[in-house]
Amino acid sequence: MARVCVVTGKKPMVGNNVSHANNKTKRRFLPNLQYRRFWVESENRWVRLRLSNAALRTIDKNGIESVLADLRARGEAV
């Protein structure tokens, strides 16, 4: 599935563009997704993930090993 963060599950949201005259038209708010490679020392390989910026902060805080363990517990293929 496109435009979904594998760690946080963030997806596009729907909202309105609001003009100065208060006219409203539908728009999508897209998550800030980035492709990042992480070296996993225990597996001796690179892992490429599509992450939101919030997920990058989570990995900085908890470490890639912990995040990958959570993904595998949820049944994600990494």
From Swiss-Prot:
Keywords: Ribonucleoprotein, Ribosomal protein. GO terms for biological process: translation. The keyword Ribonucleoprotein applies. GO terms for cellular component: cytosolic large ribosomal subunit. The keyword Cell membrane does not apply. InterPro entries: Ribosomal_bL28, Ribosomal_bL28/bL31-like_sf, Ribosomal_bL28_bact-type, Ribosomal_bL28_sf. One of its GO terms (molecular function) is structural constituent of ribosome. It holds the Pfam family Ribosomal_L28. Belongs to the bacterial ribosomal protein bL28 family. This is Large ribosomal subunit protein bL28. It comes from Thiobacillus denitrificans (strain ATCC 25259 / T1). The lineage of its organism: Bacteria, Pseudomonadati, Pseudomonadota, Betaproteobacteria, Nitrosomonadales. The gene is rpmB.
